[in-house]
């Protein structure tokens, strides 16, 4: 009788697991719902207390973060491939290796908050809500791109995301302006203004620091310190590489930018600081890019292959999260491999769209220059050629 009952139950459950929803339900029963994780303490400047040194990671959060980071990694590697196949032309700056920054920052703020960054923007485009399809299509200059094929790699925009900016450091005072708008409107929102260590010595950055401190603007200045500004190491370009201290009277913190949980908790802390009316704060994210500065830079003339390999093998952000997930029984290798396969298909489908979607028509070149009805004559257009639509 017992053998018969066992056989029946085995048959029932084997049939159930063929259905994805039930399979997911059954698999989740053997995993922990959450785990308390220790994270590295941040270095503080002009702060008595900083972010916590432990945090709770739920299973749902872990799988979401893992998938998002894998999407960004595969999307950037696909962009590398499309560039080499000449589907992508012009400038192209990839962020593989820095995924914990993109995902951790978004996890620490609200969708209604604001983000502005430099030309290394693809990952932030995705975390701000743009699809892989629209990002890759923008890279290939197609109509289905997030900027209708007119912005390319460096000029992508989305809801509460202001680029993608091509001039080194130029986005920082713009971010201070967005923060000024938040304070003026009294909406309780903050702006994350990101820049690299190469831009950290720009004069306009310090001007933005000053005005933000003077007016107590809700701006989180974030230096993504990946150790190199183009091909120059930060030790050769900066008298001090303590970027979290460069705000002078503005408090700051230095964060392990390869650990998504460190980034998330530091971002929450910084955003709360700004929302409380204390003014701006500076965050330095210690991170690393695997590619060169851009696709025209092989990235090995100013650093060794051994250096890159060492970072990949010891500090890769996706690897660190995967190990944390498995060690805390939030998932297993089999489930994570299923996510990997799903991500691979999503990126491949997006790449297919990005290489077959039509390019914008020539007649469309003067469209979308103005928000509302523009003057009939459009500056920069051929003086003998007038387009039917300019809006």
From Swiss-Prot:
Magnesium in keyword set: yes
Broad enzyme group: oxidoreductase
Catalysed reaction, written as an equation: N(6)-[(R)-lipoyl]-L-lysyl-[protein] + pyruvate + H(+) = N(6)-[(R)-S(8)-acetyldihydrolipoyl]-L-lysyl-[protein] + CO2
Keywords: Carbohydrate metabolism, Glucose metabolism, Magnesium, Metal-binding, Mitochondrion, Oxidoreductase, Phosphoprotein, Pyruvate, Thiamine pyrophosphate, Transit peptide, Tricarboxylic acid cycle
Highest taxon above the source species: Eukaryota
UniProt binding sites for pyruvate: 93, 119-120, 158, 166, 168, 197-199, 226, 228
Annotated positions binding Mg(2+): 197, 226, 228
Localization terms from the record: Mitochondrion matrix
Cofactor(s) named in the record: thiamine diphosphate; Mg(2+)
CDD domains, sorted: TPP_E1_PDC_ADC_BCADC (cd02000)
InterPro entries assigned to the protein according to its UniProt record, in alphabetical order: DH_E1, PDH_E1_Alpha_Subunit, Pyrv_DH_E1_asu_subgrp-y, THDP-binding
Gene3D superfamilies membership: 3.40.50.970
Transit peptide start-stop: 1-30
Tagged with keyword Magnesium: yes
Activity regulation information from UniProt: Pyruvate dehydrogenase activity is inhibited by phosphorylation of PDHA2; it is reactivated by dephosphorylation.
Xref: PANTHER family: PYRUVATE DEHYDROGENASE E1 COMPONENT SUBUNIT ALPHA, TESTIS-SPECIFIC FORM, MITOCHONDRIAL, PYRUVATE DEHYDROGENASE E1 COMPONENT, ALPHA SUBUNIT BACTERIAL AND ORGANELLAR
Function of the molecule: The pyruvate dehydrogenase complex catalyzes the overall conversion of pyruvate to acetyl-CoA and CO(2), and thereby links the glycolytic pathway to the tricarboxylic cycle.
Protein name, UniProt field: Pyruvate dehydrogenase E1 component subunit alpha, testis-specific form, mitochondrial
């Amino acid at each position: 009788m017992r053998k018969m009952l066992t056989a029946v139950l085995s048959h029932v459950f084997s049939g159930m697991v063929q259905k994805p929803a039930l399979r997911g339900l059954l698999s989740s029963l053997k995993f922990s719902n959450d785990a308390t994780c220790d994270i590295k303490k941040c270095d503080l400047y002009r702060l008595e207390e900083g972010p916590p040194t432990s945090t709770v990671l739920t299973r749902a959060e872990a799988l979401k973060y893992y998938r998002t980071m894998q999407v960004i990694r595969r999307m950037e590697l696909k962009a590398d491939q499309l560039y080499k196949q000449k589907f992508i032309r012009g400038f192209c700056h990839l962020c593989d290796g820095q995924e914990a920054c993109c995902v951790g920052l978004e996890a620490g703020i609200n969708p209604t908050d604001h983000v502005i960054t430099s030309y290394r923007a693809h990952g932030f485009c995705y975390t701000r809500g743009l699809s892989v399809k629209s990002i890759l299509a923008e890279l290939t200059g197609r109509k289905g791109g997030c900027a209708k094929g007119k912005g390319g790699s460096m000029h992508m925009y989305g809801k509460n995301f202001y680029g993608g900016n091509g001039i080194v450091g130029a986005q920082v005072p713009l971010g201070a302006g967005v923060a000024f708008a938040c304070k003026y409107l009294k909406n309780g929102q903050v702006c994350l203004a990101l820049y690299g260590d190469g831009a950290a010595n720009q004069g306009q950055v310090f001007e933005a620091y000053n005005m933000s401190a003077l007016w107590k603007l809700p701006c989180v200045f974030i230096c993504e310190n990946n150790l190199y500004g183009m091909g120059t190491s930060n030790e050769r370009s900066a008298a001090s590489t303590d970027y979290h201290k460069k705000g002078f009277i503005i408090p700051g913190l230095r964060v392990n930018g390869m650990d998504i949980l460190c980034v998330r908790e530091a971002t929450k802390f910084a955003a709360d600081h700004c929302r409380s009316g204390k003014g701006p704060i500076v965050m330095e994210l210690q991170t690393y890019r695997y590619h060169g500065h851009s696709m025209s830079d092989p990235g090995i003339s100013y650093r060794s292959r051994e250096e890159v390999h060492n970072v990949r093998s010891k500090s890769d952000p996706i690897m660190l999260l995967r190990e944390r997930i498995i060690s805390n029984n939030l998932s297993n290798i089999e489930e994570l491999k299923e996510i990997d396969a799903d991500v691979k298909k999503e990126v491949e489908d997006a790449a297919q769209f990005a290489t077959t979607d039509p390019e914008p028509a020539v007649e469309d070149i003067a469209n979308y220059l103005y928000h509302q009805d523009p003057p009939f004559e459009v500056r920069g257009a051929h003086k003998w050629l007038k387009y039917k639509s300019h809006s």
